[in-house]
């Protein structure tokens, strides 16, 4: 899968953990996920409502990718994250060359700039952080459960969630 954003790759990792769960395992889904080569694009322009920092999903990944590309205009800087990524680079040596030290410095500078621009105060980010830290009172969950239509819409909004009934 080429070009998925950091948040998408993180969502895929959450789904992989779900489908390899304690009480349910979907071998077909797991085989497809694990056979994929995850080539992500580092995010230079997170949106105002993005919440990838709340689930360690970016804007640039440190894990969960095989190859991660950073767009430097006329060239791409590639980080290798796994053995599968290293094998892909080795299989196409004409497409890759070692990064110059200046490119590594540029990547660090850009990452700091992107991190500084990130909207950490978005209501989605604040809510996600409260949920992940266990700061939502049980009464609130009970209230939401009463209103829940079991449509799964929340799962379409956030791939880190898997709050649905699995029937086969």
Where are these regions (language model features)?
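Iron-sulfur-associated redox domains of electron-transfer enzymes in respiratory
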Residues: 1-134, 138-141, 159
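Cysteine-centered iron-sulfur cluster-binding motifs in ferredoxin-type domains/subunits
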Residues: 142-161
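Active/binding-pocket-proximal capping segment
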Residues: 162-168
């Amino acid at each position: 899968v080429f070009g998925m954003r950091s948040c998408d790759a993180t969502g895929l990792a959450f789904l992989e953990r779900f489908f390899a769960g304690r009480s349910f395992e979907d071998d077909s889904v797991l085989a497809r996920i694990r056979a994929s080569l995850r080539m992500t694009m580092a995010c230079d322009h997170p949106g105002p409502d993005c919440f990838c920092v709340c689930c360690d999903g970016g804007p640039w990944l440190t894990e969960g990718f095989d190859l991660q590309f950073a767009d430097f205009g006329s060239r791409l800087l590639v980080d290798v994250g796994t053995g599968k990524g290293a094998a892909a680079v080795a299989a196409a040596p004409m497409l890759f060359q070692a990064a110059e030290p200046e490119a590594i410095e540029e990547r660090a500078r850009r990452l700091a700039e992107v991190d500084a621009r990130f909207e950490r105060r978005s209501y989605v980010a604040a809510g996600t952080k409260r949920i992940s830290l266990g700061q939502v009172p049980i009464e609130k969950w009970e209230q939401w459960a009463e209103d829940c239509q079991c449509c799964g819409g929340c799962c379409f909004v956030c791939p880190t969630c898997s709050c649905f009934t699995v029937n086969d």
